[in-house]
């Protein structure tokens, strides 16, 4: 200690873990969940709030929790306290817990018992615990004195893949073992002789053609269920297994999963199974699928539990999410699909179109011009009118609103539009709008104040009709307000429309895929030079004219703003205005969030629906503020929730190339469509939303490849962040609101997630996810961190620009704004705006002489990013930083960000390394009376680190950047200033830190587990030479150089120099290690074992002097550590 003086060694403690949920168990109205070695306790009291009561950290040491077994109470009362055996991997610990309504207290804890074999199952036997071990043996353990009482092996010492213990005493204990030979072995440990000789199996049961992963026994009915690698679930009639020699009969072979089945559980009336396909299926005991729960992401559902009294199923997934689902009986009241039996001799003609007026009235029109109404309360068809002018071609649309405002509109091929009051069809009003075919109809509603009907005619002319009702309510008035003109295209008609609040603009989508903004009232744009251009019939000869009009009247107003072909050539399917944003959907499988600023449409974010849903038909906003997506997945109509990643409703309708309609209210939702010449109706009570509860949001479905801290948000006392634990159990000084760190993560699942990590609650809140990438996200970079309103008018919150990059040589730039919002669980609202994107193959496709160039490898991956902040007065480049990218094709590429990230341009590249570049990092060198130098370092798979002077390269007229061989190609960066051979193999981590002496510490970690630390000196001439002289290139040299060959046992994937005397490193060996610097070779200080496997990235940052540092480790999960300096 004397050698270290008064320096205090940092001790890292785990603050937060987000890992796959591997164990679940219901105890009364509480849920026990195992996440890594931690125990999570949730309160499932449905009369109050569903919330976490307690997190017991590090209960199983370095083992993962796989199961819980609660000791039965003679009185059956587990509401006050319980004795729980927690097991997983090779560890067992017994803990006694006292719990109340909103608190939990640990009364007693046994020592951690380390077994020599894997524990597959545990069972309480009269105060002792029996364990089924991995090589077909059973041990009896006394948890109080901590000793083994019995150890009985089976004669067949095969490796097990699962086991189930049955019985309440040692004498009747039965083990059903799932062997790797795909057999079930039933044997009885108590039949062993006094010398504990191996016991022979009583029965061998075969049937599965794959390894058996899970089994469940229902004693009351004598049933055994097994889940297997062969993607099936089998139900066996076994009777009382505690009696030897019984007969085993296979009574059910259930196929419903598309991948391996991990878990199975038998209930009194149901069978629950969950697997690698992220689906939880509810079966009857006869093998019929009753329900299917989909919502988890990633590689499967790892744990299931059931609360039979409340009829809930609880699932824990690989995405670290926990969800509750209603079982049938308390479940989702779907009424299914029914035929409305339209075909009748009294109703001639064939059906042409169908629509819904609210959720309980169906409208249909036939090819003889008959309009019919079906009332779901009366349950019969009624003819409203018949008009032979609509017999060959007819469009039908009902007005929006809860019950359609009692209006519908018909249009034919001769320019005629008929507006029909449903309750008084004799009061219908005809409008002859065009001298040709009406291509489309749509309604636009502004509250209960304004109702418009838009009709598209020949030549791209859209007639806007204003609909109003007479004071008596028995008549309607139809008045043409104005006409719009769509941009030229082959299929020139609009497809949808909506009012933009407060009602000055109309947003329309057209068949070409464009989103257009029109004035709702032309009188608003009467000032010269303002608004849309008025186009006359002479300027648009194909537009046609209104009946009784002349050729000199205004035919159409052009859009004030447009986003051309936003959704591709398949067209826009819907536009919706909500919360100050415009949402558009299309048949390109995406939906856009748009913003109108200064009368201009601006794209904010592009999102994708679930995989395979290429036809998105619309969006609906739920009462709880969430959004659901309507669309077609092959021949199915699907209602999908982006929040829960769940298909809420699935209707096998045959696809979207037919007449269909959807209506949604809080009371019910309805979907009507034509099939086999009849009207089919799917109806479900309760609206779109399915009654499930997300106890904890999932993070990523695949491995997390990168993590980056953005900044910190400070909330005032009015934004109280909810604590996970009861206030009595919190440490002093941790009450109330505090600092919230904003962290972004990228994953193999192609998403970028924004997380809020409060410093006082030990929680993680997923704010939003960005799904723009088409392949995995490998690297993240942050720049321009500030506050909303800027430095002049600062507001609480955080703003930043983020660059993400990964597979398929794809890069995206988006802006991030975090603001306080008391209505959300995290007390924060996150706003994302997509700014720009870049792909190397698209860049190649845009080149005119691309036939002379070699096309970039489409499998190129961006491995790492670094922001290079140039001086703001750089001539010729304009404002904006450079982004350096390490590429798998051996290149280091420089991209220029301009216009606050809205322009992303490839500027220069170099293939100096000639092999995969793994890391890039940038730093600045500042010295008195000298220019600020920007230096980039890059590291490759050969262990070399190259240093580049970007300041000289970016100077106007500099010859450091060599001109390209062909116009349009990027510049070449030339040769580096210095190359250091730091390692013998790939460099996976790299960091630098300036020293007080004016030098730079450079640290790197390699694939061979070694560390390399050296001091880099940057030497420059004392005086800058004038323009026109020879360029000044800095001289870089290494002063001190040290290596630690065996610092870690595996790849070093994260390294950070915290100070000139302290460094921290992380590795795949799951060690977070601190090193002392400054006295020669780095000296080991201490190491902490973390629980995230395959760590791919690490980021560390100081919080404040009172809280110290925080460190985020990302891999197959996320773990946050903190330590005090």
Curated annotation (Swiss-Prot):
This protein's UniProt keywords: Acetylation, Cell cycle, Cytoplasm, Repeat, tRNA processing, WD repeat
Keyword Protein biosynthesis tagged: no
Where does the record place it?
A: Cytoplasm
Q: Which Gene3D superfamilies match?
A: YVTN repeat-like/Quinoprotein amine dehydrogenase
Q: Does the keyword Cytoplasm apply?
A: yes
For this UniProt entry, the molecular function terms from Gene Ontology, in alphabetical order, are: enzyme regulator activity; insulin receptor substrate binding; tRNA binding
Q: Which InterPro entries match?
A: Quinoprotein_ADH-like_sf (IPR011047), tRNA_Anticodon_Mtase-Reg (IPR051973), WD40/YVTN_repeat-like_dom_sf (IPR015943), WD40_repeat_dom_sf (IPR036322), WD40_rpt (IPR001680)
- Report the residues modified as N-acetylmethionine: 1
**In terms of one coarse class, where is the protein primarily found?**
cytoplasm
State the tissue distribution. Answer: Expressed in hypothalamus, hippocampus, cerebrum cortex and cerebellum.
Protein's job: Together with methyltransferase FTSJ1, methylates the 2'-O-ribose of nucleotides at position 34 of the tRNA anticodon loop of substrate tRNAs. Required for the correct positioning of the substrate tRNA for methylation. Required to suppress amino acid starvation-induced autophagy. Enhances the STK11/LKB1-induced cell growth suppression activity.
The record ties this protein, via PANTHER family, to: WD REPEAT PROTEIN, WD REPEAT-CONTAINING PROTEIN 6
- Quaternary data: Interacts with FTSJ1; the interaction is direct, and required for 2'-O-methylation of position 34 in substrate tRNAs. Interacts with IRS4. Interacts with STK11/LKB1.
Similarity comment: Belongs to the WD repeat WDR6 family.
Protein's name according to its UniProt entry: tRNA (34-2'-O)-methyltransferase regulator WDR6
Species assigned in the record: Rattus norvegicus
